[in-house]
A protein has these predicted regions:
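Short, well-ordered beta-strand segments enriched in hydrophobic/aromatic residues
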Residues: 145-147, 166, 176-178, 205, ...
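Accessory, solvent-exposed terminal regions and/or long lumenal/extracellular loops of proteins
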Residues: 278-283, 793, 798-901, 918-925, ...
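Extracellular/luminal ectodomains and secreted, surface-exposed scaffolds of diverse proteins
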Residues: 110-115, 899-923
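N-terminal signal-anchor transmembrane helix specifying type II single-pass membrane topology
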Residues: 2-33
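A low-complexity, Ser/Thr/Gly/Pro-enriched, surface-exposed linker/loop concept
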Residues: 129-145, 158-203
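Surface-exposed beta-strand/loop patches in extracellular or lumenal glycoproteins
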Residues: 180-182, 188, 192, 756-765, ...
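Catalytic-domain carbohydrate-binding cleft regions of carbohydrate-active enzymes
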Residues: 3-13, 40, 44, 48-55, ...
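Extracellular Cys-Trp
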Residues: 94, 107-124
Length: 934
């Protein structure tokens, strides 16, 4: 054979080799859809860069190919592999700081930048070896496949084989899991479980595509082809204590991933957010009390989607301006839910279908709550409540912090300072008030045996968390050395119920405030320290306050019924809330009230949340709004911040403005720390008192409307305190607003948040908005308006087309619930409006589920308002409509008819076009009509 023939054969062999390489890297099994690189499509990058992998030579010239056979067969220039824009780099050294040689030893690209912060210097090339996906095989709920690695990654204890399950959960929810098929790793099991179903594949709102080698997947919105998730942009890593998954984002408008001290829209400029529950007063760049691995994305055209990673281990989320996001978890599995919406409210509803709809709070819990660490005796506590009553400040619930407890031990009360605590509680009850006290999880372990039954009984019943040697782990909290109940143990939940029952038989509290339940400890891990192990010193620790996972909490090697604390830490508050809610339900046989500091997805089913130890300053006042709105997205509608602040001394002006804003938190409580100046409303000057009193009366007048919103949250997963973007998804201006918010779809709240301000620029989305105070209309095309805001005013506007039920306020909800109702009717340009009222006894369990409630629809049109009671149970029988205001009546009416009878008491203001009808007494349990005749 001649030289030419040899050359021809060589060329043909090379061509076949190259074609084989291209085929293997660009096509899928017969079950999977063929795709190119969505990353390349989105960023206009040459496609051939995704076909091969050719590791760079390290600086020390020692070649360490990860896939040598691939680099030999498909040798394409490394330059294009690393030619990646800085904002689109994905960090190859997240687990540790790497030198250039260490970076290149991993097969990654190294390209320093002038600034030390921001894009990584060590980053993945366009194609990086990882898992290879086998054929997709149908399963009862979708399809599954096996993922294998040809060679290990750079991580210790790499898992070489994974099981992928693609689950078509519902038409609007895609569920994907990645697990180790050879080992039972910890998986989160939410109390009450997660619903399981299978969607009709013909009607789903999404399509899925898989890249087989290296593995990645893409989720698209079926209606427009938009990429919702694309994980082909960076490698999947799955080791025993390090799980990493990256994805592009459909837009830069991202919210969620709490609990953090942030704006509502997250900063995507190389921001790192750690999800690891910690006793930490809110401040920037800190992991706080709760962990919620859920985010919602506002897409450019007003559509929205959400993503939930069901994982309770320590998680770090890296946001970058690509826009893109990287999940890094220290354990568990990858259990992803993608919610297709298509609108923001639907995304939240779909999310709550997985984690559970929120509980229905008792009506009284929507009133004003007052607390302070420093009410040191029952007499002091009595005087506070009496002074509030004497000064005509509405208040429903008096609280006590740990001052009540004997030697700061829970389930006791101090015999000297709080010896008549039971009598005081009964006095409050006779006045129509409620009483709540704090209940920390830590149980004192140093009392003389036989003198403190919670610990003695807990020892006998084996309910406490153990250390690595099997002994009770002892931490340190307020009473000193303490043991911690293991709420994942059913025996512990029964013991907890017994402790609450015994205490409740002496002190009939109406609810419980569960604090310090991250869980918090004043020593690192335990009083004896923690063992040196992979759990205490994992290969990778996210950026946590204190630098270690056991900082300010328990040892990670601590043993609980379900797993190690390493896996369960973020669930502690949720499991305690579940146990406390269940106990109160059985003991009181009424709707439980629980308030928790620590949180995790699903806690809204059992508890409300407050935002922790906020400082008394204007910045914290401002940031309280996005904090409250975040919890609305997380399925926790009963949420609020400590009005006037907890830490530091408030000022009169700050406290007035905070009480005005707090009047529109779904949960309103004034609470502060004992070293600080008192901040009860009555301690301030007369002008400030009048402003605070006005805010409280306004809140109490709106409680029927607020209660109805909570019903819709409980029954339909609607939000109560609502970001503007959820109601106006097609309005670009609404996307960024987090200094204003809505109650439901009807009320727009625009508080003063700056010191010394007497006016504010408020954004009014496209609509006609009426001032709640005087009915003045504002016709907005979606613009900012400068509104007067003197110290006695909070601007609240009613949206056209809505009817707001109100009730004459009183000093307690016990009294106000018997008062006449009133309606605010905000007419649209076409003269119509609609509203509703949910009403029951305010405290019985499952009234909606048991059909034991009243529900009334109000409609306005053709110059009349009509009520239509769709369901009645007697709760409204003695209540009447006392009057109504109609906003937007174009001209003065000649007369008013109520159920066909003329009404004499009415007024009309030509300047604001407001009709006010008074002196009515129309039964709320019957159909009524109020008509204005021109």
């Amino acid at each position: 054979m001649g030289l030419l023939s040899h050359f021809t054969v060589a060329v043909l062999l090379f061509a076949f080799s190259l074609l084989a390489c291209l085929f293997m890297n660009r096509f899928f099994t017969s079950e999977a859809r063929q795709i190119g690189s969505v990353w390349d499509q989105q960023h206009d990058i040459t496609a051939h860069g995704r076909l091969v992998y050719n590791p760079a030579k390290p600086q020390n010239n020692s070649s360490r190919d990860i896939h040598p056979e691939r680099s030999q067969k498909c040798n394409i220039s490394r330059g294009s592999e690393c030619a990646i824009a800085p904002e689109s780099r994905f960090d190859c050294g997240r687990d540790k700081l790497l030198s250039q040689s260490e970076c290149e030893d991993r097969g990654c690209c190294y390209a320093p930048l002038p600034d030390s912060a921001g894009p990584p210097w060590c980053f993945y090339p366009r194609v990086y070896p990882g898992y290879k996906m086998g054929p997709l095989i149908p399963t009862p709920r979708g399809q599954g496949a096996t993922l294998t690695r040809a060679s290990p990654s750079y991580l210790p204890k790499d898992i070489s084989t994974l099981r992928l399950d693609d689950i078509q959960e519902t038409t609007d929810c895609f569920h994907l899991t990645l697990k180790d098929p050879s080992s039972q790793r910890y998986e989160v099991h939410l109390p009450g479980g997660v619903p399981q179903s299978k969607a009709n594949t013909q009607s789903v709102l999404y399509t899925t595509e898989y890249q087989s080698d290296p593995f990645g997947f893409i989720v698209r919105r079926k209606s427009n082809g938009r990429v919702i998730m694309n994980t082909t942009v960076a490698p999947l890593l799955f080791a025993d204590q390090y799980l990493q998954l990256s994805t592009t984002l459909a837009s830069s408008f991202v919210s969620g991933l709490g609990e953090h001290y942030t704006s509502l829209l997250l900063d995507l400029n190389w921001t790192s957010l750690t999800l690891w529950n910690r006793d930490m007063a809110p401040h920037a760049d800190a992991n706080l009390y709760g962990s919620h691995p859920f985010y919602i994305v506002q897409e450019e055209d007003g559509l929205a989607h959400g993503v939930f990673l069901l994982n309770s281990n320590a998680i770090e989320v890296i946001l970058q301006p690509t826009p893109a996001l990287t999940w890094v978890s220290t354990g568990g599995i990858l259990d992803l839910y993608i919610f297709l919406g298509p609108d923001p409210q639907s995304v939240i509803r779909q999310y709550l279908q997985i984690i559970g709809y929120p509980m229905m709070p008792p009506y009284w819990s929507l009133g004003f709550h007052l607390c302070r660490w420093g009410y040191t005796t029952t007499n002091t506590t009595r005087k506070v409540a009496q002074r509030m009553h004497d000064e005509n400040f509405p208040m429903d619930v008096q609280w006590n912090d740990l001052d009540y407890a004997n030697k700061r031990r829970v389930f006791t009360f101090d015999p000297w300072r709080f010896g008549d605590l039971p009598e005081m509680v009964e006095e409050f009850h006779k006045r129509g008030m409620k009483y709540i006290l704090i209940l920390d999880p830590g149980i004192s372990s140093t009392s003389t045996p036989g003198t403190y039954s919670p610990f003695d009984d807990g020892l006998k019943r084996d309910v406490f968390i153990k250390n690595a040697t099997g002994q009770i782990l002892i931490g340190k909290v307020w009473p000193g050395p303490t043991a911690f109940p293991d709420f994942t143990n059913p025996d512990t939940r029964q013991w907890w119920e017994d402790c609450i029952r015994d205490f409740h038989s002496k002190v009939p509290v109406d609810g419980l405030w569960i604090d310090m339940n991250e869980p918090a400890s004043f020593v690192q891990g335990s009083v004896e320290g923690c063992p040196d192990s992979d759990l205490e010193n994992p290969p990778y620790t996210p950026s946590v306050v204190g630098g270690r996972l056991n900082s300010g909490t328990l040892c990670m090697s601590a043993r609980q019924k379900m797993s190690f604390h390493y896996n369960l830490h973020n669930l502690y508050g949720l499991t305690e809330a579940y146990a406390t809610h269940s106990a109160l339900l059985k003991i009181r046989r009424k709707r439980p009230f629980v308030l928790s500091r620590s949180s995790f997805p699903g806690i809204g089913r059992f508890s409300g949340v407050w935002t922790g130890d906020v400082r008394s300053d204007w910045e914290q006042l401002r940031f309280s709004i996005p904090a409250v709105l975040q919890f609305s997205l997380f399925g926790v509608p009963l949420v609020g911040a400590d009005t006037c602040g907890f830490g530091g001394n408030t000022t009169e002006e700050l406290c007035v403005r905070w009480m005005q804003l707090g009047a529109f938190y779904p949960f309103m409580r004034n609470h502060n720390d004992k070293p600080n100046a008192p901040q009860e409303p009555y301690v301030f000057g007369q002008r400030a008192q009048a402003a605070m009193r006005s805010a409280l009366y306004l809140r109490y007048s709106l409680l029927p409307f607020l209660y109805t919103l909570f019903h819709h949250a409980h029954a339909s997963a609607e939000t109560v305190a609502r970001p503007l973007f959820m109601e106006f998804p097609n309005d670009p201006n609404s996307r960024t607003i987090d200094k204003q918010f809505l109650w439901g779809s009807s009320l727009l709240i625009s508080p003063v948040l700056e010191q010394g301000a007497v006016e504010l620029a408020a954004y009014l989305p496209p609509a006609t908005w009426y001032s709640l105070h005087n009915g003045q209309p504002f016709y907005s095309k979606g613009q900012f308006l400068l509104l007067p805001a003197p110290l006695d005013t909070i601007n609240v506007h009613v949206r056209e087309g809505h009817i707001i039920p109100q009730q004459e306020p009183a000093l307690t909800t016990t009294a106000s619930r018997n008062n006449p109702f009133f309606l605010i009717v905000a007419l649209s340009a076409g003269g119509w409006a609609r509203g509703d009222l949910f009403w029951d006894d305010g405290e019985s369990v499952d009234t909606f589920e048991m059909q034991n409630y009243c529900y009334v629809i109000f409609t306005a049109g053709q110059s009349q308002v009509v009520s239509n009671p769709l369901k009645l149970n007697g709760a409204l029988d003695s209540l009447v409509l006392g009057g109504l205001q109609v906003f937007g009546v174009p001209s003065p009416p000649r007369y008013i008819l109520a159920n066909g009878e003329k009404v004499r008491d009415f007024t009309y203001r030509t300047d604001t076009k407001v009709l006010a009808v008074t002196s009515l007494a129309l039964p709320m349990s019957e159909v009524f009509t109020v008509q204005w005749v021109f």
